[in-house]
UniProtKB/Swiss-Prot annotation:
InterPro entries per UniProt: UPF0729_C18orf32-like
A Pfam family this chain is assigned to: DUF4512
Polar residues composition-biased segments: 74-83
Lineage, opening ranks: Eukaryota, Metazoa, Ecdysozoa, Arthropoda, Hexapoda
Species whose genome carries this gene: Aedes aegypti
Protein name in the entry: UPF0729 protein AAEL015238
Amino acid sequence: MVCVPCFIIPVLLFLWHRFIQPYVLRFWNPWEKKDKDGNVIKDGSSTEFPFQCKGGVCPFPVKDKAKQEVAASGSGSNGTATAVGSEGEAEETKKSQ
C-alpha cells in the first residue's frame, strides 16, 4: 500500500501546476521585466525567429554536409541513423589503432 504523503503530494503539485499557478502568475510574476513605474516591458524580439536568411544565404549553415547529402539522396529508410552508425564505426576503428 502507498503511504499517504506519497499519494497526496503529487496530487497537490498537479493541482497547483495545472489550476492555481496560472492565476497566481497573472498578478504576480517575478520573471517579468518591469520599468521603474512597475509597468511590464514587452520585448518584441523574443517572439521573432532570431536567425534570418537574407538573399538566399543563411549565416548559420548546416554543420555536417555528409548528413545533409545522405538525407538529400534518400537512401535507406532512416538516413540519419545510417550516417550516425557509420560515423560511430569509423571512430571505433580510429580508437583501436
